[in-house]
Amino acid sequence: MYVVSTKQMLNNAQRGGYAVPAFNIHNLETMQVVVETAANLHAPVIIAGTPGTFTHAGTENLLALVSAMAKQYHHPLAIHLDHHTKFDDIAQKVRSGVRSVMIDASHLPFAQNISRVKEVVDFCHRFDVSVEAELGQLGGQEDDVQVNEVDALYTNPAQAREFAEATGIDSLAVAIGTAHGMYASAPVLDFSRLENIRQWVNLPLVLHGASGLSTKDIQQTIKLGICKINVATELKNAFLQSLKNYLTEHPEATDPRDYLQSAKSAMRDVVSKVIADCGCEGRA
């Protein structure tokens, strides 16, 4: 009952004018903080993991943890495959019980991207699994990229409609100027492009690379159709910096049950802020 597909979550967000945050988890403490905070705020959240996270923790272990915590807190949770690229890997995890998938073939030419994504969609929809795919590519900040090159990396609004119709995806991740990781300076998001995509595509839209974005920018993207906000680096950085500071100030510390508390507190602040920025408190 409590481990759910993201499809209904994102459709509700689209109707309600808010976004659902997807937090990439890397250890037990991250998952505890995300679930506890979401439950306290009655906010819908998505537990996301890259292939590396699933390899590190084990698919069955992650599924068991999410299921147990959803029941413990009486709070619906979705567990989501983030940036997965291999069909066989996705199929295995779906058969294990995962109900939300992002197939990332955005590095491929347009026609091949469609073909790869449609293969995954056709398989996943047999299991009532929701599928997200990306059109366009996120990068880092590269000063030597020319305007026409940047445009080629961003999501083309007209192509977005063709892509959505040809693949049958449930949500679309768009490239409008965000990047994975934290920003050295404030990014310039292409809001007009996002608005055009919204006019061409009626699916819930997804924003990757949201770590470090301002509240104003996040809320503006939501007004223009973003229904899912991905956060990873911001959580990792909060965990790491707090842990470093604690161990520097308490070099005698040896018990992780003690020294991880400050790291959890720092992550809790991040999760609370993202939920507030997404406007999803009280929506679960």
UniProtKB/Swiss-Prot annotation:
Q: Where are the active-site residues found?
A: 82
What is its cofactor? Zn(2+)
- SUPFAM superfamilies according to UniProt: Aldolase
Q: Where are the transmembrane segments?
A: none
Q: In which pathway does it act?
A: Carbohydrate metabolism; D-tagatose 6-phosphate degradation; D-glyceraldehyde 3-phosphate and glycerone phosphate from D-tagatose 6-phosphate: step 2/2
Report the record's disulfide bonds: none
Q: Could you give one GO CC term from the UniProt record?
A: cytosol
Q: What is its EC number?
A: 4.1.2.40
> Which residues are Zn(2+)-binding?
83, 180, 208
Q: Which reaction does it catalyse?
A: D-tagatofuranose 1,6-bisphosphate = D-glyceraldehyde 3-phosphate + dihydroxyacetone phosphate
| Sorted UniProt keywords | Galactitol metabolism, Lyase, Metal-binding, Zinc
NCBIfam families listed in its UniProt record? cbbA, PRK09195.1, PRK12737.1, tag_bisphos_ald
Query: Could you tell me what this protein does?
Result: Catalytic subunit of the tagatose-1,6-bisphosphate aldolase GatYZ, which catalyzes the reversible aldol condensation of dihydroxyacetone phosphate (DHAP or glycerone-phosphate) with glyceraldehyde 3-phosphate (G3P) to produce tagatose 1,6-bisphosphate (TBP). Requires GatZ subunit for full activity and stability. Is involved in the catabolism of galactitol.
Q: Which PANTHER family match?
A: D-TAGATOSE-1,6-BISPHOSPHATE ALDOLASE (PTHR30304), D-TAGATOSE-1,6-BISPHOSPHATE ALDOLASE SUBUNIT GATY-RELATED (PTHR30304:SF0)
Protein name stated in the entry = D-tagatose-1,6-bisphosphate aldolase subunit GatY
